[in-house]
Amino acid sequence: MTEQNDDQRGFSRRSTLAMPAAGLGIAALGAALSPIGVAEAATMGDEFIPPHATKLKALTAALAKAPRRRDFKSVPMILTSADQYDSEALHLLFAYSGGPKQVWDNTALDSPWLNLMRNSMNAQIWSWKHPDFIAISATHGTAHLALYDKYIWDKYLTKFTGGKVKSNTWVDVPAASKVSASDYNNPKGVFSPLDNSIVVLQKRGAVFCACHNEVWELTMGILKKGINPDKLSHPAMAAEFTNHLIPGAVLTPGVVGTIPQFQLAGYQYAK
């Protein structure tokens, strides 16, 4: 698939690749989907999720309440217990009865991954009239760097990237997000290419899944480069990175191994 990159942000994939059921019970919310048009858009105001997306709104609210354990002292290479990852949030996603449902295999930070997710959401919601459409990012590879907070970037990642990237700009909120969502066809508005942001997509109902395997392998590479100011063990550093995933991220025990679980739950694979 070829569409314009988010920004490219000066980040070379070649260089970075060298870096080492809770069922929601929402039958009551299953009202018939209504086509989205100008009249409904006018009622959106500052809301990024369409008014008739009742199932998506219910899921988003449930996910916000689902626990995210972020107090680890040490984590193993392979997770074997549900309390080591965000099991409740994942099962909410598996049980989601809205749709269509799409899971994106996102691996490259310098690819147009956010742009593609945004375009998919726009077409499904506005063109195909599916307000309860959900897009999941199964994030790994260099794209996973976008799922760490400022603490991790300041402490490790700016140095790890050789100063090529100094902060996590993928979570910045662009000025376009301030435009009223009711003006959905505004080429400089909320749904435009100027608003490719993880935070904005989350507000629209997209979910970004993190990968424990990527956490483990990234921290292994960081240790090999000698970036370890606190002299942490590998399990302790992996725990620190896990504790500093961005708000709203859903930790999987391994995202490549979790994609089949999404597919079993009816999600369509996209790359």
Regions found by a protein language model. Give the residues of each.
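N-terminal secretory signal peptides
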Residues: M1-F11
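Acidic helix-start/capping segments at beta-turn-to-alpha-helix junctions
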Residues: H130-I152
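A glycine-rich helix N-cap at a beta->alpha junction
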Residues: L157-D183
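Histidine-anchored nucleotide/phosphate-binding helix
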Residues: P112-W128
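C-terminal segment of N-terminal export signals and the immediately downstream linker at the start
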Residues: A31-D86, L92-L93
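N-terminal export leaders
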Residues: F11-V38
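Glycine-rich, aromatic-bearing surface loops/beta-hairpins
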Residues: P35, L223-K271
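Acidic/histidine-rich, surface-exposed loop or edge segments in extracytoplasmic proteins
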Residues: L90-T107
